[in-house]
């Protein structure tokens, strides 16, 4: 769908020079002299980078519709994660690169939203939090409490994370997947 610059809004997906971009920020400028333009901040959906781009009033932009499907992780195979569609149970490989940094904190059957463009997966939106059991934790040292004392633990999926020294083996913890930080202990 073709759009004029005044129709571009935050959250839209545009095709610019063959790449897909999500509109992060827009600023419409109408100077007293000259023609209007729009200043945008765009996030590349396939390369995970951001650019700032200015479009002139006469330019036409191409808006694209993305398909979003609720899927769950089945297993990993090579460089792919095999996802299963929650509606029709179809299995589909998706590149690990979309969730590589948080993969050690994801259990099988974790629900996620997978984004498709023209039938091909182009992104994965993971949940914000993961609740996991601590399988290995060293004992915290008594008196080691200056500042925010932390130690490294291993969780049931094999991932390692820094936590406060009071967390021990067998505890269930909540991890924020957006920045891979400890949130809290969770009661069973």
UniProtKB/Swiss-Prot annotation:
- Which SMART domains did the record assign? EFP, Elong-fact-P_C
Q: In which pathway does it act?
A: Protein biosynthesis; polypeptide chain elongation
The record's subcellular locations are: Cytoplasm
Please provide the record's keywords in A-Z order.
Cytoplasm, Elongation factor, Protein biosynthesis
Give the matching InterPro entries.
Elong-fact-P_C (IPR015365), NA-bd_OB-fold (IPR012340), Rib_uL2_dom2 (IPR014722), Transl_elong_fac_P/YeiP (IPR020599), Transl_elong_KOW-like (IPR013185), Transl_elong_P/YeiP_cen (IPR001059), Transl_elong_P/YeiP_CS (IPR013852), Transl_elongation_fac_P (IPR011768)
Pfam families, alphabetized: EFP, EFP_N, Elong-fact-P_C
GO MF:
translation elongation factor activity
Q: Name one GO biological process term.
A: peptide biosynthetic process
Any GO CC annotation of this UniProt entry: cytoplasm
Please explain the role this protein plays, according to its UniProt record: Involved in peptide bond synthesis. Stimulates efficient translation and peptide-bond synthesis on native or reconstituted 70S ribosomes in vitro. Probably functions indirectly by altering the affinity of the ribosome for aminoacyl-tRNA, thus increasing their reactivity as acceptors for peptidyl transferase.
What NCBIfam families does UniProt report for this protein, alphabetically? efp, PRK00529.1
Q: Which family does it belong to?
A: Belongs to the elongation factor P family.
Q: Which PANTHER family match?
A: ELONGATION FACTOR P (PTHR30053), ELONGATION FACTOR P (EF-P) FAMILY PROTEIN (PTHR30053:SF12)
Which named protein is this?
Answer: Elongation factor P
Task: Please give the organism.
Answer: Leptospira borgpetersenii serovar Hardjo-bovis (strain JB197)
The gene that this protein is the product of is: efp
């Amino acid at each position: 769908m073709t759009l004029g610059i005044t129709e571009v809004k935050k959250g839209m997906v545009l095709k610019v020079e063959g790449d897909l971009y999500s509109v992060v920020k827009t600023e419409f400028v109408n100077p007293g002299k000259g023609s209007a333009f729009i200043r945008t901040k765009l996030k590349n959906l396939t390369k995970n980078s951001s650019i700032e781009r200015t479009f002139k009033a006469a330019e036409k932009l191409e808006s694209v519709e993305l398909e979003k499907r609720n899927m769950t992780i089945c297993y990993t195979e090579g460089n792919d994660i095999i996802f299963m569609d929650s509606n029709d149970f179809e299995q589909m490989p998706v590149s690990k690169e979309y969730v590589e940094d948080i993969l050690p904190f994801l259990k099988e059957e974790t629900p996620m939203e997978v984004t498709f463009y023209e039938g091909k997966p182009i992104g994965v939106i993971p949940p914000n939090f993961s609740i996991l059991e601590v399988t290995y934790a060293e004992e915290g040292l008594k008196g080691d409490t200056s500042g925010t004392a932390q130690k490294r633990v291993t969780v049931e999926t094999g991932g390692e994370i820094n936590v406060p020294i009071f967390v021990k083996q067998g505890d269930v913890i909540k991890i924020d997947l957006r920045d891979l930080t400890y949130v809290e202990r969770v009661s069973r």
